Amino acid sequence: MNKGRVTQIMGPVVDVKFDGGKLPEIYNALTVKQSNENGTSINLTFEVALHLGDDTVRTVAMSSTDGLVRGTEVEDTGKAISVPVGDATLGRVFNVLGDAIDLDGEVPADVRRDPIHRQAPAFEELSTKVEILETGIKVVDLLAPYIKGGKIGLFGGAGVGKTVLIQELINNIAQEHGGISVFAGVGERTREGNDLYHEMSDSGVIKKTAMVFGQMNEPPGARQRVALTGLTMAEHFRDEQGQDVLLFIDNIFRFTQAGSEVSALLGRMPSAVGYQPTLATEMGQLQERITSTNKGSITSIQAVYVPADDYTDPAPATTFAHLDATTNLERRLTQMGIYPAVDPLASTSRALSPEIVGEEHYEVARQVQQTLQRYKELQDIIAILGMDELSEEDKLVVHRARRIQFFLSQNFHVAEQFTGQKGSYVPVKETVRGFKEILEGKYDDLPEDAFRLVGGIEEVIENAKKMMA
């Protein structure tokens, strides 16, 4: 075994000197297992990041370096961090190193373990088939539909509902889809992960889900690598079992943020806004592995925090380039009480074309967007001069646009405990029919509030009857 000693500790970054000139390779895992003087045991894993010369390597710790001292002996494992894969991971909760952190005991020693670093699938192995993934959420299915085996980003600032939307998608898709899911909690709140675990346990979805967490309280090394741990588990189900896997990542921005912290500690020159100079490379290495091959598919749904609601920030801007569909959450809509607060004009999908979704769906979606865009243009006139100054045609546009805007809202199953109202799953056909009839003017006589937070168009009619009674 190749052994070295700790020569310098800078928070989560540790320098290790190896004698004899045999240095561990980049990405190799190094371990420390010993007790210090006051009797507390230290069990640490580092990942090699740089070769500094003078037989010294600079490493990043995967857990807190409290209690570590210079001179501590370190062992080279000779391979990268490896995590359990396969059916043994289902129903379990892991940390970045693949150690079980639930109450169901250790993972058996004979379970296969795969390294978290690997190449993306070769060009000729990739699949190009396009199939729509129904979510049951009206605004998504109509205006920015998701692709099976595609990459989807949920963009939004703090507190606009990204995690709630991810939880609803887990509820709707994982239960309907019935396949295997992997959830990676990257640098988010431990409470949310705990809530999600208990919700999934209650609904039974946990039996087909592997969960990996490296939350806000973890050092940056763990937050940076935990997405790769989850991805490695998902890749095994895709490549070895030919499964269609769902991969949820909450939050991909924290992956970038952790990379930025590590980069500064490793002594790299910062780039724009203080981010790491390797931002695009790191994001590309992760995203290119999340793909569909001839064997199976990985459909990934990633929450992306937008710092200070600024979409030009390098972190969200770099993520945009990799996605097939984007769902943009807007603070202005939360203030209007429209949930999910998805911006129907800013959200995009490459699947919204007549060849993929069909002519009728495409036409209805485009008409909805045109109506909302015209309403947006008229808002300045309304604010200055009032509704009375509009032409009859524009008054009708505003009238219908407000109904469309409210009808894009919906009650969620995961929010039942807050709203006291049952969540709704709306099939795509129902969604298209409902919006088509609103555009045709069938419901011009119904009150606006009847359209708020409902499922299908039948619920609107019921609400209107109650209001008019």
UniProtKB/Swiss-Prot annotation:
Location (main, coarse): membrane
One cellular component (GO) term of this entry: proton-transporting ATP synthase complex
Secretion signal, residue range per the UniProt entry: none
Membrane-spanning ranges: none
Enzyme class: translocase
Reaction(s) catalysed (UniProt annotation): ATP + H2O + 4 H(+)(in) = ADP + phosphate + 5 H(+)(out)
Membrane disposition: Peripheral membrane protein
UniProt EC number: 7.1.2.2
Localization per Swiss-Prot or TrEMBL: Cell membrane
Organism superkingdom: Bacteria
InterPro entries on file: AAA+_ATPase (IPR003593), ATP-synt_VA_C (IPR055190), ATP_synth_F1_bsu (IPR005722), ATPase_a/bsu_AS (IPR020003), ATPase_alpha/beta_chains (IPR050053), ATPase_F1/V1/A1_a/bsu_N (IPR004100), ATPase_F1/V1/A1_a/bsu_N_sf (IPR036121), ATPase_F1/V1/A1_a/bsu_nucl-bd (IPR000194)
PROSITE patterns recorded: ATPASE_ALPHA_BETA
An example Gene Ontology molecular-function term: ATP hydrolysis activity
One Pfam assignment: ATP-synt_ab
Binding residues annotated for ATP, in chain numbering: G156, G157, A158, G159, V160, G161, K162, T163
Oligomeric form and interacting partners: F-type ATPases have 2 components, CF(1) - the catalytic core - and CF(0) - the membrane proton channel. CF(1) has five subunits: alpha(3), beta(3), gamma(1), delta(1), epsilon(1). CF(0) has three main subunits: a(1), b(2) and c(9-12). The alpha and beta chains form an alternating ring which encloses part of the gamma chain. CF(1) is attached to CF(0) by a central stalk formed by the gamma and epsilon chains, while a peripheral stalk is formed by the delta and b chains.
Function: Produces ATP from ADP in the presence of a proton gradient across the membrane. The catalytic sites are hosted primarily by the beta subunits.
Family note: Belongs to the ATPase alpha/beta chains family.
Name of the molecule in the record: ATP synthase subunit beta
Organism listed in the record: Bacillus anthracis
